[in-house]
Every structure is written in C-alpha cells, then in structure tokens.
From Swiss-Prot:
Residues 1-199 are annotated as: DHBP synthase. The gene is ribBA. It comes from Geobacillus sp. (strain WCH70). Zn(2+) binds at C255, C266, C268. GTP binds at R250, V251, H252, S253, E254, Q271, E293, G294, R295, T315, T350, K355. Its cofactor is Mg(2+); Mn(2+); Zn(2+). This is Riboflavin biosynthesis protein RibBA. The keyword Transmembrane does not apply. GO terms for biological process: riboflavin biosynthetic process. Pfam families: DHBP_synthase, GTP_cyclohydro2. Binds 2 divalent metal cations per subunit. Magnesium or manganese. Binds 1 zinc ion per subunit. Keywords: GTP-binding, Hydrolase, Lyase, Magnesium, Manganese, Metal-binding, Multifunctional enzyme, Nucleotide-binding, Riboflavin biosynthesis, Zinc.
Length: 397
C-alpha cells in the first residue's frame, strides 16, 4: 500500500510530487508534497488541477521571522494547530493567483537575500510554520514537508496541497492509492516518516554523569536530554557494560504517586525497588528511568484517570474516556539511551510484551524476559488484572 521513505526522498530530489498520508485518527487525509525549491509552475498547476485543495508552503520558524511573516490570527483555534502566517505574493506579480506567479512567489521566499518588503500582504501563497523538531513534535503535513526537504539536502521548505475528490469530498487512503497509481507517484505515511527519523537520527544528548549512593547500592547516574521535546531522563548504571554480553535492564516509566508517595493503586514503586535490588545483586545492569508519567499521559491526566477509576472504570477504560490510547509510551528514546550506554543485548526486567516489542523494534536484542511481578493488594488487584486481561501483561494470579 505504502512506499519506502527512501523512495519518496529520491523522487522529491528529482523534482517529482509525492503523496503523504496522515493517521486515520487525525485528519485521515493525503496531501501532494513537493520540494519548494523545485516547485515549478508545472508542479503548482498539477497540485491545483488534481489536488483541488489549498496550496501552502511549509517553512521554518527562522524564515518566518526573517521575512516578518506574522501569524494569520493571534489566537489559533484550529483543532490541529495549523500555523498559517499572513498570505503573500511576490512584489512583481500581478494578481498572484496563476500557477506561474505562485511559483514565482515561492522561489522568492527561498532567496537568501529576500526581505520582508519583497512581499505583498495578503496574497495567494499561504506559508505554514513548521514546529521545531518536525514530525517528532507534531505529526502534520507541515512538519512532514520540511522534514522531507531536510532529508533531501534541500532548502527546508515544501509545497503541499490537500487532495480532494472530483465530488468535493476528501480523498481517503484507498482513493489516494488510486491517484498515486494513476500518476505513478510514491505514497508514504507520516507515521513511517516518524519511525524513519527515529531510526536514523540521534535524538538524545548525554548531559552529566555522577556517582549516586542509594539504599540499594552505589550506581552511576547518567542524565540525558531528549533534544526534540526537552524531557530529561536518567540511567542508573551498575558495573561495566559489555556490548556483546546480555545486560540486566529495567526500563521504568516515571510514576510520582507510586515511586515517591508509595501509592497502593499500582505496583510501580515496588517494581522500581525490586529492579534496583536485582541489578545490585547481579553486579552489572541498567535501570533506565523515563519521564513517561501515567503510561505517557502525564501526571494531571493520570490523576483524572484515577478519578474515573473511582467511578468504576478500569485503567484502560479511564485512559480511553480521556481520549488517550491505553498505553501512550514510546520506547525509541529509551532504546537510543541504551545504545549510547553500550547495551546491545539485554535480559529485560518486565511483564509487558509491548515493551519487549518496542525495544526490539529499535535494534536491541532481548535475549531473556525476567519477570517482575509484585504481590497484589486490595487497592491494585483490579488494576493488575486489567493489565493482564486487556494489555496482555504476563502476570500470574
């Protein structure tokens, strides 16, 4: 159904148009995408004729600032936060609406000597400002176009146009596939672009390393920053990591209520302590503490989920009532930290099959699952049973 990201990059570099689809639970739409620097009048005309949507130009924050392209509105109420700037035409255009003149405006935007006074406002070209971090921060067509331009080694700007069917309704994936086949276009997804970037780019920075004596033993604490979202994570390392030998590893998601306050609603605190004890006894291992509170939904939303649980919902139902998946955690950043530490093979302390799959998917080998089941109590028994029944956690009752 979909093509490889590498194939799409090659086509874009040749000046061709591709189709980029987003997720079904987002806009569930496809856009024509091209490099801005290769947006000839023919490319623009193709998008207008067969896309039928609004032709926009995703650019960086730096370019928007340089050309004084202010936001179209002061208060953006769009559900997806699409960052339109004021629309523009190049100063030497006439009406600015033809494919030729829109192409002229786009090329003028990319001129390194361009200045704010070169453009009339409003106009017929609609710049969109991509978030820093690209699709890793916002999974939109705006960010995808700029990311793809960068991956092509081109100027970081694109041209996009929503694809609408002849009857005026939005083209969905099956329709988009037919269009791609008709015009021999590559078709990719933003989801695949996200995974491609996570595989190819280093997204963590090692910041500091100190010795940390604890009640469980002495560990080396190594702090990391996610360079995309700024979140800070820490690895507690015991002994020497030998890449070719399996390392005992626990990837533990932050749980303030359980880890710090000793909440009985979950088993997080006891799991954290048990993992540290086992690593200390082993004499070599890693506990990776990830800032993914509440299975990724954050502290306040976790407390909201607790409120719903008090009304009879289980932990999965509560997340879904709040509009979140049952488990929003991502293991790509954790995998990059483990690789930075020299871990390639691991004995993973977990009951969660998704964690095993997630880490394997980022090139790490899980040679053994080491169970980490804690005794249930009257406060968390339903929670644990729900994880067993609905999330597939490997638990025994």
């Amino acid at each position: 159904m979909f093509d490889m990201i590498e194939e799409a990059i090659y086509e874009l570099m040749q000046g061709k148009v591709i189709i980029v689809c987003d997720d079904e639970d987002r806009e569930n739409e496809g856009d024509f995408v091209a490099l801005a620097e290769k947006a000839t009048p023919e490319v623009i005309n193709f998008m207008i004729k067969y896309g039928r949507g609004l032709v926009c130009v995703p650019i960086t924050e730096e370019l928007a600032d340089k050309l004084d392209l202010a936001p179209m509105v002061n208060h953006n109420t769009d559900s997806h936060g699409t960052a339109f700037t004021v629309s523009i035409d190049y100063k030497s255009t006439t009406t600015g609406i033809s494919a030729y003149e829109r192409s002229m405006t786009i090329q003028a935007l990319l001129d390194p000597n361009a200045k704010a006074s070169d453009f009339k406002r409003p106009g017929h070209v609609f710049p969109l400002v991509a978030k820093k971090g690209g699709v890793l921060r916002r999974a939109g067509h705006t960010e995808a176009a700029v990311d793809l331009a960068r991956l092509c080694g081109a100027k970081p700007a694109g041209v996009i146009c929503e694809i609408i069917k002849e009857d005026g309704t939005m083209a969905r994936v099956s329709d988009l596939r037919k269009i791609a086949d008709e015009f021999d276009l590559k078709m990719i997804t933003i989801k695949d672009l996200i995974e491609y970037r996570r595989r190819k780019e280093k997204l963590v920075k090692r910041e500091v390393e100190v010795m940390l004596p604890t009640e469980f033993g002495k560990f080396k604490a190594i702090g990391y920053t996610n360079i995309v979202d700024g979140k800070e994570h820490v690895a507690l390392v015991k002994g020497e990591i030998i890449p070719d030998e399996p390392t005992l590893v626990r990837v533990h998601s932050e749980c303030l209520t359980g880890d710090v306050f000793g909440s009985c609603r979950c088993d997080c605190g006891p799991q954290l302590h048990a993992a540290l004890r086992q690593i200390e006894e082993e004499g070599r291992g890693v506990l990776l503490y990830m800032r993914q509170e509440g299975r990724g939904i954050g502290l306040i939303n976790k407390l909201r989920a607790y409120k719903l649980q008090e009304q009879g919902y289980d932990t999965v139902e509560a997340n879904e009532r709040l509009g979140f998946p049952a488990d929003l955690r991502d293991y790509g950043i954790g995998a990059q930290i483990l690789k930075d530490l020299g871990v390639t093979k691991m004995r993973l302390l977990t009951n969660n099959p998704r964690k095993i799959t997630g880490l394997k998917g980022h090139g790490l080998e899980v040679v053994e699952r080491v169970p980490l089941q804690m005794p249930a109590n009257k406060e968390n028994e339903k929670y644990l049973r729900t994880k067993y029944e609905k999330l597939g956690h490997m638990l025994h009752f």
